């Protein structure tokens, strides 16, 4: 859905300007960041803190703007357009040139790429030859980080890219940021961005194939066993194995590949039936005090 292209060139210009600040400024920031990174990625808990930090930041966009806020308004779920004084009027009326809409759109673009930048830093430490990340934590940390990176790029593609088709797949739309480099990455076609999203999701699925959720369920509560780490519980609140497969189904559907979308979706349904991971909510769970 090509809804925000009006602001994209301006945002890229800002990014280029940011890379041309003085060397002293960059040196100071780099030094401080390197020290903080060294401390953060000293153990498994530090890696989990970095990953959880991205999940926490998501609330800033997905708590409203990219859920029940601006996007739902643009989908005409609310009767807003009739009231020209409404704070969401510009979104409802598709007035993309208005300052308020531009400001929100800029925030979406920059925030999503900021989340991606943090994930890339985390991923670079996962793959470092001197990584302190244990074999137990690595599939979860790296798998979820890759899935989140794909998820954010997919939202950027849906929002700023074209309505996908054979005629538009080669439209140049956006960069796929997959390194910690401050260099502006080349703009890619919608087809190439989608391919990189699928690549990240496939790798995430492989890493998470032994996700505890498949054997133990969502584990939606703390354990009495002191050796049962909380980091591996509450799997329904994270991009777990099933969520990655569901995201692949969404991507296939967006690309118009209904056969693979169907195959991914039905595989999740079958897996849940066989493994019983997501039971129906019992009445007393929502009515008891």
Where are these regions (language model features)?
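Membrane-proximal, proline-rich intrinsically disordered regions
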Residues: 23-72, 265
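Conserved, well-structured interaction surfaces
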Residues: 86-160, 183-191, 206-208
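Alpha-helix C-terminal capping/termination sites
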Residues: 155, 159-162, 217, 222, ...
